[in-house]
Amino acid sequence: MDRHSSYFFIWLQLELCAMAVLLTKGEIRCYCDAAHCVATGYMCKSELSACFSRLLDPQNTNSPLTHGCLDSLASTADICRAKQAQNHSGPAMPTLECCHEDMCNYRGLHDVLSPSKSEASGQGNRYQHDSSRNLITKMQELTSSKELWFRAAVIAVPIAGGLILVLLIMLALRMLRSENKRLQDERQQMLSRLHYSFHGHHSKKGQVAKLDLECMVPVSGQENCCLTCDKMRQAELSNEKILSLVHWGMYSGHGKLEFI
């Protein structure tokens, strides 16, 4: 008992450690347009809590953008630090930018990095930021609803499968019981027929044996054939088409029957 309790406490401590690691290890969701993110709704989770947006062609400022989690890059977050230092030191257009909020890289790279040059541009950026936030919120709600339906399906499908399996087992048991009952009825009928035929055959056989015994015993020393017995035997066995082939011979004084 003590051994099992010690195992239980060790397992509980391991579970608590794993939960603590998961809680301390932050993850954020990022917009991802890579091929491997299509199945996950164009989203990925970053264990480094960093998303990126960059130009596919650094030499062309109008180049299309690519987005994703920083974990998918070859290096770590040092790329973001180096690029940030380069961005602050020179006026050149940056080719990569990192952010650390959920779906923060959904906006374009130019919208994220371009500073507001005037009050009008600041208001436009603020309006675009609000609209992008609303879009991000809608995407998160859609993803949450998809996850909810997926969890419901994961729970409902095994339950439905179990119910179908139980119904199939009950149907199979019912079929087996009906088949067993039918076989028992057929067996009972067969046994009844055999019983009746066996007893009827023995009763007829007993009557024939009794008639043979009466015919074998000589009556008052007569030496002629037992014609009366033969007639009685023929009358009894007329239904079965059996004829008596036994003819009694002369009865000698030594008590022996001789057949002719």
Curated annotation (Swiss-Prot):
Which region is the signal sequence? 1-26
| GO BP: any one term | negative regulation of BMP signaling pathway
Q: Does the keyword Signal apply?
A: yes
Spell out which residues lie on the membrane's Cytoplasmic side: 174-260
Q: Which GO molecular function annotation, any one, does this entry have?
A: frizzled binding
Which species does this protein come from?
Answer: Mus musculus
Write the record's keywords in alphabetical order, separated by commas: Glycoprotein, Membrane, Signal, Transmembrane, Transmembrane helix
Q: Which Gene3D superfamilies match?
A: CD59
Query: One short Pfam family name for this protein?
Result: BAMBI_C
Family of the protein in this entry: Belongs to the BAMBI family.
User: Which intervals lie on the Extracellular side per UniProt?
Assistant: 27-152
Where, if anywhere, are coiled coils annotated?
A: none
Q: What does this protein do?
A: Negatively regulates TGF-beta signaling.
What membrane topology does the UniProt entry give?
Single-pass type I membrane protein
Keyword Transport annotated: no
| Major localization class | membrane
**Transmembrane segments annotated in the record for this chain:** 153-173
The protein's name is BMP and activin membrane-bound inhibitor homolog
